[in-house]
């Protein structure tokens, strides 16, 4: 296994943002998204309902916009912090994600991932086997429902992007900045959506916007889930926790087909991203070329990732994720 700390030092050469390339990546994502979205709306309004079949494609472009917003949050899109922030806020209007709220939560996720004593910041709620057994029957049922794929990939993304992001949940007492971020994003999104509503009506706009957003949201949650929820994941108590170990061993390499790799902005190379989050998304493949040992480390294909949704609990004794059925056998 590569030494995580040495890798962090080696990866510094990939960290410098490339503004020209970044703006190009934004252009070839935002312009097609807007054009495709407008085309679907016009076609659907004209009665060509088959145009709605294109909403998943629009959703993929929206997902890529979120990845670019994600780079802004890490300061890896442009060289200037303020420029990163304002581009991130602009993109948040399209992704329905208040940038300042999300970027703080996501920074905490990076700082605390894999730490059993600091769970709950921008991650998928995960109990240990012992904690699950200590819960009441009602609490265990609630956790089972939460971990069900229908919740994680269906209700969860819808709740997160349609409802939770409308307010600075978790940050309500941390300053006006986060209220302005959430409410300002809401108003700006409504202002943009007012244009198609005025042109073709609320019904057609909703019929295009909702599936586009929900497809992108579900894809995003799928990516986020498999990035840290896999059999040999990394979880340690605070006294034994290591940032570098958590980054390298607690994150996967989701090896996707080239088209999906493009739409997901290479974020599947997640172990590298957690080791050095300021590497621009378009440079992550360069790291794999320079460090071939990272290719097969925690590597999963899209198909293999689906089995990870059976995992539900962290077993501290075996140091691995287990299913509810496996936990039941262990505890009797």
Go through the PLM ranges and name each one:
Residues 157, 191, 195, 202, ...:
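Cytosol-/stroma-facing membrane-proximal "stalk/adaptor" domains immediately downstream
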Residues 17-65, 93-96, 143-159, 175-223:
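Alpha-helical bilayer-embedded segments of polytopic membrane proteins, i.e.
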């Amino acid at each position: 296994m590569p030494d995580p700390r040495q890798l962090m030092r080696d990866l510094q050469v990939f960290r410098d943002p490339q503004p020209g390339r970044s703006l190009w990546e934004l252009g070839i994502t935002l312009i097609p998204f807007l054009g495709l979205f407008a085309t679907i709306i016009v076609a659907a309004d004209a009665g060509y309902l088959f145009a709605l079949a294109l909403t998943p494609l629009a959703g993929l472009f929206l997902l890529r916009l979120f990845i670019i917003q994600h780079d802004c949050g890490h300061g890896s899109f442009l060289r200037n912090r303020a420029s990163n922030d304002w581009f991130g806020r602009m993109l948040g209007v399209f992704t329905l994600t208040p940038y300042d709220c999300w970027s703080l939560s996501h920074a905490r996720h990076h700082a605390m991932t894999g730490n059993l004593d600091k769970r709950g910041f921008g991650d998928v709620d995960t109990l240990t086997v012992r904690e699950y057994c200590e819960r009441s029957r009602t609490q265990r049922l609630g956790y089972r429902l939460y971990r069900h794929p229908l919740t994680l990939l269906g209700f969860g993304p819808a709740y997160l992007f349609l409802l939770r992001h409308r307010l600075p949940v978790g940050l309500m007492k941390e300053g006006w900045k986060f209220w302005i971020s959430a409410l300002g994003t809401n108003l700006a999104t409504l202002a943009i959506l007012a244009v198609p509503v005025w042109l073709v009506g609320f019904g057609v706009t909703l019929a295009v916007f909702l599936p586009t957003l929900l497809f992108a949201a579900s894809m995003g949650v799928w990516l986020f889930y498999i990035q840290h929820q896999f059999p040999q994941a990394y979880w340690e108590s605070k006294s034994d926790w290591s940032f570098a170990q958590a980054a390298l061993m607690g994150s996967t390499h989701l090896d996707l087909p080239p088209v999906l790799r493009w739409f997901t902005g290479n974020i599947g190379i997640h172990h590298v991203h957690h080791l050095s989050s300021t590497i621009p998304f378009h440079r992550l493949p360069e790291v794999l070329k320079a460090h071939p040992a990272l290719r097969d480390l925690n590597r999963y294909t899209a198909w293999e990732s689906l089995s990870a949704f059976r995992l539900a609990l962290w077993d501290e004794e075996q140091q691995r994720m287990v299913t509810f059925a496996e936990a039941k056998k262990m505890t009797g």
